[in-house]
Amino acid sequence: MASSGYNPYVEIIEQPRQRGMRFRYKCEGRSAGSIPGERSTDNNRTYPSVQIMNYYGKGKIRITLVTKNDPYKPHPHDLVGKDCRDGYYEAEFGPERRPLFFQNLGIRCVKKKEVKGAIILRISAGINPFNVGEQQLLDIEDCDLNVVRCVFMFFLPDEDGNFTTALPPIVSNPIYDNRAPNTAELRICRVNKNCGSVRGGDEIFLLCDKVQKDDIEVRFVLNDWEARGVFSQADVHRQVAIVFKTPPYCKAILEPVTVKMQLRRPSDQEVSESMDFRYLPDEKDAYGNKSKKQKTTLIFQKLLQDCGHFTEKPRTAPLGSTGEGRFIKKESNLFSHGTVLPEMPRSSGVPGQAEPYYSSCGSISSGLPHHPPAIPSVAHQPTSWPPVTHPTSHPVSTNTLSTFSAGTLSSNSQGILPFLEGPGVSDLSASNSCLYNPDDLARMETPSMSPTDLYSISDVNMLSTRPLSVMAPSTDGMGDTDNPRLVSINLENPSCNARLGPRDLRQLHQMSPASLSAGTSSSSVFVSQSDAFDRSNFSCVDNGLMNEPGLSDDANNPTFVQSSHYSVNTLQSEQLSDPFTYGFFKI
């Protein structure tokens, strides 16, 4: 029964989905499917629905297909499904069906050669909702077979109960065949990357559903900004792939910016669902130099860590170097065979002997091989020295490698005696029997002493119970060298130790090398150093070291290296460099 006061009309509750449905041919032999509603999802299927407003009662509904554009003409495609015949849907409904849902409607397409026959069939059946002229209906050139619209027409019963009163028809949104590229739903299936530089130019491969190469574009959108990807028709591969380059962003950025990327068809302004695309800020180090440096630094640090696991092997000290890295000045030896005299016998009756408190010692060896040079006589024995008697119980040495005799020493051996004259030498401590006191030399009765007597001194009667351990040169080499060397004063006897006091250390450190040496042309070989050796204690080497047999004259002999150590650490940067008697070492 019609409602009084208001005219009834038809309203579409849910429009059919425009895209995503495929039109089927009759030859496919299968159902054309159902037209989904526009709000349909995979989890919640919905269908087109309509409702008659201002009317409650029975009625009849007819649904036909018309063309996309106005004037809406009958379309050659057919509606198929339940309650469908001759290409259209028609059914009666009662007051209980509110609203009306159409879930079994499908679209079956016809071939192009069958289009005209289908239009004639519609005219004969009276299917012309908008009363378009017959001549215009037969003009099928402008008919788009890929797009249709649904027309909903309602008929109300008259007084006789026949459904003859028609309500104004209503047209739905267009429905596109998903199989046709010019009307199909646009969809981005996959891209090889979804980010790129803010400067643009990144090449992107995009896979999609069928598109027309002359009717498609890739669009980048963010608020009011819009840009398009750069590609040509040749970059569209078989309607399903597009290779394009990204456009540059509108401004420089410091942080990544996300925009929307979508496909758009210019002919109908259809767009696909959007996909996020991130613009990345421009790299400050475009060529990766910073990362290369970091990688190199990490490799170097790892190399250092790996090398740190290996302990450093102790290196053999080179010839002439000490344990602290100090070097001894190596000069030519006075002797041809490197002969070392043994230590003189020690006197055991010295009372009041102080306890040594300097345990570290040094030694100077005379084992350096060299050629025997000629030695001019540059020093003479003072005539004021008393004569020295020869003891018979304490010889100096009988173990010489060269022809060494008491009577063959040259007169240059007298140059050793001035070394015993210095006031500093007179204060040497008597901590061992091998020390000497030059003060006792003044009490000697003999005014002069021969070289043989000098090297035979070993008794308390001659040097006040303090014999000096010296090394004598060979007889055959005394007249051939211009650079003679005194042998050594040894500080390496653990039983005969001496310690320098703080005052002595300062004096030794302040001592000038020029005050400790004299040229070969000077009147004396040794210069008196009273300030330098004042109250300095020295000790002689023991017999075990001095009498070591088989001392090689080779400079690389380990025996020489072992006997070349000293530890008087305060003699830094001091070189006792007498060119005739000895070449003291450099620290």
UniProtKB/Swiss-Prot annotation:
CDD domains: IPT_NFkappaB, RHD-n_c-Rel. GO terms for cellular component: cytoplasm; nucleus. It holds the Pfam family RHD_DNA_bind. Keywords: Acetylation, DNA-binding, Nucleus, Phosphoprotein, Proto-oncogene, Transcription, Transcription regulation. GO terms for molecular function: DNA binding; DNA-binding transcription factor activity. GO terms for biological process: positive regulation of DNA-templated transcription; positive regulation of interleukin-12 production. Residues 8-297 form the RHD domain. SUPFAM superfamilies: E set domains, p53-like transcription factors. The keyword Transmembrane helix does not apply. The modification Phosphoserine is found at residue 267. The modification N-acetylalanine is found at residue 2. InterPro entries: Ig-like_fold, Ig_E-set, IPT_dom, IPT_NFkappaB, NFkB/Dor, p53-like_TF_DNA-bd_sf, RHD-n_c-Rel, RHD_CS. The keyword Transcription applies. A motif (Nuclear localization signal) lies at residues 291-296. It is found in: Nucleus. PROSITE patterns: REL_1, REL_2. Signal peptide: none annotated. It comes from the Eukaryota. Residues 403-468 are annotated as: Transcriptional transactivator. Proto-oncogene that may play a role in differentiation and lymphopoiesis. NF-kappa-B is a pleiotropic transcription factor which is present in almost all cell types and is involved in many biological processes such as inflammation, immunity, differentiation, cell growth, tumorigenesis and apoptosis. NF-kappa-B is a homo- or heterodimeric complex formed by the Rel-like domain-containing proteins RELA/p65, RELB, NFKB1/p105, NFKB1/p50, REL and NFKB2/p52. Component of the NF-kappa-B p65-c-Rel complex. Component of the NF-kappa-B p50-c-Rel complex. Component of the NF-kappa-B p52-c-Rel complex. Homodimer; component of the NF-kappa-B c-Rel-c-Rel complex. Interacts with NKIRAS1. Interacts with NFKBIB. Interacts with NFKBIE. PANTHER family: NUCLEAR FACTOR NF-KAPPA-B PROTEIN, PROTO-ONCOGENE C-REL. This is Proto-oncogene c-Rel.
